[in-house]
Amino acid sequence: MEYGLDLEYSFNEFLKGFGLSSEIAHIIWLPLPMLLVLVAAVVGVLVTVWLERKISAAAQQRIGPEYAGALGVLQPIADGLKLLVKEDIIPAKADGILFTAGPILVLVPVILSWLIVPFGQNLLISNVGIGIFLWIALSSIQPIGLLMSGYASNNKYSLLGGLRAAAQSISYEIPLALSVLAIVLMTNSLSTIDIVNQQSGAGILSWNIWRQPVGFIVFWICALAECERLPFDLPEAEEELVAGYQTEYAGMKFALFYLGSYINLILSALLVSILYLGGWGFPVPVELIAKFLNLPINAPFLQVFTASIGIVMTVLKAYLLVFIAILLRWTTPRVRIDQLLDLGWKFLLPISLANLLITAGLKLAFPQFFGG
């Protein structure tokens, strides 16, 4: 059974109340999804940057930012304004077109991937039936932008960083996709909505993390590598490559890389929440909540309540994972490039492939637990 609100339907019905036709209401709705995505992504980045600076300060027994607003909450905005007013420099011997296109090609696919993220039942920007396939396809574009940025800079450190970034992204893209395929196999759907609904039967006990513990670990490791977070930040290792493919960038072009990295981290955490932790699902079944409140399951108040708390649950699970990623960055050493590639090709790839085959076998043997 479906609970919650349909964002597009509710908006169109609201406009119809003012006498507008269905066609005009739909036209007004069309540009809003991308605007909502941009606002959600930017706000998420501001919160995550502030959290990272505060958590890293606590890990190193420092205070962290505290002067830009209360507890330094305005520090990310100050950083953004600083980068906005800095001079935009293109090196004399760089390829200007590729140099400019690189950061855009890195950022745009990550933002578009947010279109398939559901924050609640029917509360998503675009209900694409092949949402998982779309996300995997969009994420495969990013290595092209990274390699393009490194090559166009005409700098040896940038080129090495770009090559490392492309190799790392390709190496971890395959086990990541295989771990997601195991979820798709159990759900019989590529829709993120269907994947969450499949985990809503018995509260926390029906979450995919219990049926796919290996897939969960593989996905999270690969997601951190895709986001180039420590211990997988080889493409921009300061001690070796200055700043990797970002070395020659300044101002807003550098900010686009910075923005893309954090948006990708939040997106990865949201996808882990959706695929393995029940998404907007409660730890207890909604039927028990309705019984406790003595309300029918389709009561309007209960629908609004579950939709609102569902958003909080999705974001809370995602930021718990972001917190873990930040702690890992400031408490683990960087691996070598050969160790990085060995982990991806010699360990995670065979493990994710074996996990997919075992899931297929378990689905045939126990269809009631692993999808029919």
UniProtKB/Swiss-Prot annotation:
Its main location: membrane. It catalyses: a plastoquinone + NADH + (n+1) H(+)(in) = a plastoquinol + NAD(+) + n H(+)(out); a plastoquinone + NADPH + (n+1) H(+)(in) = a plastoquinol + NADP(+) + n H(+)(out). PANTHER family: NADH DEHYDROGENASE SUBUNIT 1, NADH-UBIQUINONE OXIDOREDUCTASE CHAIN 1. Its EC number is 7.1.1.-. Belongs to the complex I subunit 1 family. InterPro entries: NADH_UbQ_OxRdtase_su1/FPO, NADH_UbQ_OxRdtase_su1_CS. Keywords: Membrane, NAD, NADP, Plastoquinone, Quinone, Thylakoid, Translocase, Transmembrane, Transmembrane helix. The chain crosses the membrane at residues 27-47, 97-117, 128-148, 176-196, 204-224, 266-286, 308-328, 347-367. It is a multi-pass membrane protein. The gene is ndhA. The lineage of its organism: Bacteria, Bacillati, Cyanobacteriota, Cyanophyceae, Synechococcales. GO terms for biological process: aerobic respiration; photosynthesis, light reaction. It is an enzyme of class 7 (translocase). One of its GO terms (cellular component) is plasma membrane-derived thylakoid membrane. It comes from Prochlorococcus marinus (strain AS9601). NCBIfam families: PRK06076.1-2, PRK06076.1-5. NDH-1 is composed of at least 11 different subunits. NDH-1 shuttles electrons from an unknown electron donor, via FMN and iron-sulfur (Fe-S) centers, to quinones in the respiratory and/or the photosynthetic chain. The immediate electron acceptor for the enzyme in this species is believed to be plastoquinone. Couples the redox reaction to proton translocation, and thus conserves the redox energy in a proton gradient. It holds the Pfam family NADHdh. It is found in: Cellular thylakoid membrane. The keyword Nucleotide-binding does not apply. GO terms for molecular function: NADH dehydrogenase activity; oxidoreductase activity, acting on NAD(P)H, quinone or similar compound as acceptor; quinone binding. The keyword Membrane applies. This is NAD(P)H-quinone oxidoreductase subunit 1.
